[in-house]
Amino acid sequence: MLNFLKKNSDNQEKTERCFDSSKPVADHIAVIMDGNGRWAQKRMLPRIAGHKEGMNNVKVITKHASKLGVKVLTLYAFSTENWKRPTDEVNFLMKLPVDFFDVFVPELIEENVRVNVMGYKEFLPAHTQKAVENAMEQTKENTGLILNFALNYGSRAEILTAVNDIVALAKSGDLPDEVDEKTFSSHLMTASLGEALQDPDLLIRTSGEERISNFLLWQIAYSELFFTDKYWPDFTTTDLEEAIGSYQLRNRRFGGLKDTTEGDA
Ligand code: V07
């Protein structure tokens, strides 16, 4: 009897969490694409095979997000901490933007996707920088989904860069006495997305970890968080719809008002 009740309530929860095409989708979705190495190890493959599979999934999820009407997809591709990984793995990762450019950019152009890259690009190898520049240049006229890669990105470093930029402005006498949220945000890397799209509505992390790991700390102040045990290469378009469905359900609890105060008393 108890089991029956439990099953019933699980089913109900699943139905409620379903994507609803009549409700607004999350405009800006950020993803921590975790679990590529573990996906490979589970299959007795080298970790780099997981990264390659993860890259293929970027294309699949981007296309589906674009179809659903998502405006920005921000993907954590390489963190400032990832340099500590074995040299061979880092070298392989640094080639992925090149591969991605060759294999997927023509398809994404057809899909009207614009590629943007934020992060400390100047520290990337020359061939990676070139691929990034090409991807951004060749898609700059596109007006559809913005595929925003965080590459050599770290949120604390981003915040400190913003502080230092503001200090430099203040020294040159170019700043009002007080810095407000809007001014501060305009110095963050997400400012390149345009004023309305800087903060993610929904943050997804795959692979079972429930941490933020130095990703968009300022920008996720009001974001809904969605964690799944699936490894990134196994994360499907249905999983994306489930994450958006969960966002739509939680958003509905605020009565359709854009809530910017903590707690929902
Ligand atoms: C990377 C594939 C996705 C899973 C997570 C880590 C590995 C796409 C890019 C990329 C970046 C910039 C760009 C075009 C493509 C990428 C890295 C790793 C370093 F302009 N996937 N992907 N870059 N992975």
Predicted segments with their positions:
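Flexible, compositionally biased loop and terminal segments
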Residues: 1-265
